[in-house]
Amino acid sequence: MAFCLGFIMNVRAAAASALYQVVDLGHSLSNALPAAQQQIRPRDHALLQEICYGVLRQLPRLESISQALMGKPLKGKQRVFHFLILVGLYQLSFMRIPAHAAVGETVEGAQDLKGPRLRGLINAVLRNYQRDQEGLDAQATSHDAGRYGHPGWLLKLLKESYPEQWQQIVEANNSKAPMWLRVNHQHHTRAEYQALLEQAGIVTTPHAQAEDALCLETPCDVHQLPGFAEGWVSVQDAAAQLALTYLAPQAGELILDCCAAPGGKTAHILERTPESQVVAIDCDETRLKRVRENLQRLELTAQVICGDARYPQQWWQGEQFDRILLDAPCSATGVIRRHPDIKWLRRADDIAALAELQREILDAMWQQLKPGGSLVYATCSITPQENRLQVKAFLERTPDARLVGSDPAQPGRQILPGEEAMDGFYYAVLSKQH
């Protein structure tokens, strides 16, 4: 739904509009949320995000409660009001907002969504929930989808893939993600920057393996971070920062960052090895704009190319690379805590299609690697089909490929969501024999 510029919208209405776009129209939350933020006061941005993330984390439970209270769901042009009801239910169930304010503000949201006649219905639904909250909550969490907040196909996949750990994964997926920083080694050591943060009253914890990573005790606005505008620090999860550890770039090498957007790993390579030549490719010109913006803020230089990794003949300049970082397109099932819309935008059959795309890119990139060079295969997924099984199949069909640093029976390192406070990620290091 679109609204005129200059109109200050009720936060609950803006949240309902964004949720409608994500769940019903299939838009990503990363697109829907900024559009909704433009309709509200800046001071309400955090509340909007909390509501949208929360509803998406608890969607099956809230849908179940709504169905029990209403019988027939709202349809057609009234669908956005269905999401307004979910917004109200989420506040009453999970937020510390006083009940009268949560109900009153949500009911008023109907006015901004051009549905004043539905205020009575929304008020009645929310009041009825308050009267029997315990019973309705128990009913809504009596089935797995409502209890765990995940679609059936994903729960099944997690249970099959991780029979001992699936509940911890689900819990991590439904939790708030911590804020990790990557200290720019060109300006400060991690210890030096941690001291600067401490002087600013910001408490952090270093990561044991990711050498430049600091975890904030309490997330904050990036503009509160010392030297952010000057490029002293960036926001990047510790798991993503491990790409540098596994890639181990050396000065003077020609390095390819494949599927590079939004450019965090490209920047990290250059921060640590400014003497290296880095080529960053991605097939999405819009997302490459982010790469260029990040490099500009950090005062780093890379060759940024828009190209399809499956068809290097269209963009490759003829010289093989010493190292390749292939952060492959994936299901993103390792970063659900940061992008809860993934649970509802992904479908079970996406996994096989993505695995086939990854296979094509991996085979194409292998031809661009020098003999003696190494390729790091990475995803922010936790599905075996995209990770361990993908690498196993690659090794079986590629005679000059060798796995580095892990057991061929269980190739690579699978990081699960929440492990050492990190996102879910996968890494495998492959060397090319002479």
Swiss-Prot record:
Keyword Ion transport in the entry? The reply is: no
Q: What is its EC number?
A: 2.1.1.176
Binding positions (S-adenosyl-L-methionine)? C259, A260, A261, P262, G263, G264, K265, D282, D308, D327
Instruction: List where in the cell it is found.
Output: Cytoplasm
User: By its UniProt entry, which Pfam families does this protein fall under?
Assistant: Methyltr_RsmB-F, NusB, RsmF-B_ferredox
Is Cell cycle a UniProt keyword of this protein? no
Show the disulfide pairing. none
Return the protein name.
Ribosomal RNA small subunit methyltransferase B
Q: Which organism is it from?
A: Vibrio cholerae serotype O1 (strain ATCC 39315 / El Tor Inaba N16961)
